[in-house]
């Protein structure tokens, strides 16, 4: 999401993804042959996701970032010395509402990179269209995505889902 070449800003996104998929599949087959192993069944996916995206300060998958500023929470086991260390350092924390006796939740303020795409920068339809392009031209499976929908967009989203019903999964 943070690389314009891999977003709707690239007018040739469909052909870019198709070519990259061809190369990835061919490379997988070539190296499987060289190593004498079966080729992977599915090699294309949308990354980074979750924890890895945090390590490299990247948007997760094809999700737009939530906002320019947000609070990231991390859970720590109360028996873990790192949890006690973080508490001793004054990192904002509170007991987990589900496991208050055993888990502490730490809160970290996060600032998105300058010019990062956030959920308010794209309409729900733009988010869905980009997801559909990735499904059709990159992923060998169904990519997942979280779509942020404004109150006035629900009818258009419903129409999009109806029009693409046979392709809808992971949204």
Question: PLM ranges: what are they?
Answer:
Residues 1-2, 29, 83, 158:
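Predominant activation on well-ordered alpha-helical scaffold segments within soluble catalytic domains
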Residues 1-4, 164:
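Extended amphipathic alpha-helical segments enriched in small hydrophobics
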Residues 48, 55-171:
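Catalytic alpha/beta core of large soluble enzyme barrels
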């Amino acid at each position: 999401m943070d690389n314009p070449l891999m977003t709707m800003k690239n007018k040739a996104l469909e052909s870019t993804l198709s070519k990259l998929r061809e190369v990835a599949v061919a490379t997988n087959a070539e190296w499987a042959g060289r190593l004498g192993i079966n080729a992977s069944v599915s090699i294309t996916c949308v990354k980074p996701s979750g924890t890895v995206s945090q390590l490299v300060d990247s948007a997760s998958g094809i999700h737009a970032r939530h906002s320019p500023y947000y609070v990231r929470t991390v859970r720590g086991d109360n028996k873990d010395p790192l949890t006690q260390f973080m508490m001793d350092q004054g990192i904002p924390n509170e007991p987990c509402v589900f496991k208050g006796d055993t888990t502490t939740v730490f809160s970290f303020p996060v600032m998105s990179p300058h010019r990062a795409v956030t959920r308010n920068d794209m309409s729900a339809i733009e988010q869905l269209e980009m997801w559909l392009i990735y499904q059709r031209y990159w992923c060998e499976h169904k990519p997942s995505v979280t779509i942020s929908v404004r109150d006035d967009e629900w009818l258009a989203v419903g129409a999009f889902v109806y029009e693409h019903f046979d392709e809808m999964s992971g949204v």
